[in-house]
């Protein structure tokens, strides 16, 4: 980044005199900015030795467009903002390699919140009698009041890969217990 530079010079322009508007002679001098962009090493040396121009005609010839100024400022900002992130030796992925792999659905706990009651264990049932409706809180029929269910992805193990678990002969009994609510999470 030795050859990239952006110089900003501020110069006062002479006051505007006009024959048609006599009030223009009493206006203060306007400040004009001069921005020059140097993208190569040769240009950077020329930019560092350049002096602000005082003649209005010469300044108009050398003033870059607004689009070029904006492109230069954006490029310098992006280069300076992205610099430190490229030099970081340890990223987020290197931290994840040291941790053991866990199930993505339950984060390794083996249990998930019940989707019917939201983990409260209570289920809102509607009791309709003639003109008014009454809500009754009963035990959740999905989790049987516990608020948690066994994770259906890892089957309560907390591991992301349990391919051989369902091939075992006792796996059918395990699944039946899990779906009927007889197997408890964390057991």
Swiss-Prot record:
Principal cellular location given in the protein's record: plastid
Alphabetized GO MF terms: protein-disulfide reductase [NAD(P)H] activity; zinc ion binding
Record keyword Zinc-finger present: yes
Organism superkingdom: Eukaryota
Location in the cell: Plastid, Chloroplast thylakoid lumen
Gene Ontology terms: cellular component: chloroplast; chloroplast thylakoid lumen; thylakoid lumen
GO biological process: photosystem I assembly
Zinc finger (CR-type) stretch: 90-163
Transit peptide: 1-94
SUPFAM superfamilies associated with the record: DnaJ/Hsp40 cysteine-rich domain
CXXCXGXG motif repeats mapped onto the chain: 103-110, 114-121, 140-147, 151-158
Purpose of the protein: Nuclear genome-encoded factor required for the accumulation of photosystem I (PSI) during plant development.
This protein's name: Protein PHOTOSYSTEM I ASSEMBLY 2, chloroplastic
Organism whose genome encodes this protein: Oryza sativa subsp. japonica (Rice)
Organism ancestry: Eukaryota, Viridiplantae, Streptophyta, Embryophyta, Tracheophyta
